A protein has these predicted regions:
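Intrinsic disorder/low-complexity detector
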Residues: 1-21, 47, 52-103, 141-143
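Phenylalanine-focused residue identity feature
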Residues: 11, 26-28, 68, 112, ...
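Hydrophobic alpha-helical segments, especially N-terminal targeting/anchoring helices
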Residues: 34-41, 124-126
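Mixed-charge, glycine-accented linear interaction segment located at domain edges/termini
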Residues: 111-143
């Protein structure tokens, strides 16, 4: 994660001089992952795990919530208009093994950005920062 570089995305539609360095946030289980980026360079500054009691969505004016549920991942997020995404593995995703990871990727999508949102849980985005898939990391994979 230390070398992760991103283009800055203005999720809130604000102008450059009022956008804060807080760019993305994922809620997972009873906590949040905050991802801080530099507006000027797009480089990752730090990642924090916050308690569920913090009022983060008010602070950053947007929210992304990820839920793993059986063979699906559900991602709710605000991006201009509210968008709801639910992916069923059996119907829409291709499964791969890559570098000790199980990767579920939407057909025809390529991974531009990988973010570990929780230990061993990964989200993948395409070059338009739309979710391309998700995966899990297996450090002790049996061959």
């Amino acid at each position: 994660m230390e070398n992760l570089k991103l283009k800055m995305i203005d999720f809130t539609g604000k102008s450059e001089n009022v956008v804060s360095e807080r760019d993305m946030i994922f809620s997972f289980n009873n906590g949040e992952i905050k991802i801080y980026l530099s507006y000027e360079t797009g480089e990752l500054k730090k990642i924090e795990i916050a308690s569920e009691n913090e009022k983060i969505e008010k602070e950053i004016e947007r929210e992304a919530v990820l839920k793993f549920k059986g063979n699906s991942v559900i991602l709710d997020y605000e991006y201009g208009l509210y968008e709801y995404v639910e992916i069923e593995i059996e119907d829409k995703l291709e499964k791969y093994w890559a570098d000790g990871k199980i990767v579920y990727l939407k057909e025809g999508k390529k991974i531009f950005l990988e973010i570990e949102i929780w230990e061993g849980y990964l989200l993948f985005f395409d070059d338009e920062y739309r979710m391309a898939g998700f995966g899990t990391e297996s450090k002790n994979r049996k061959k």
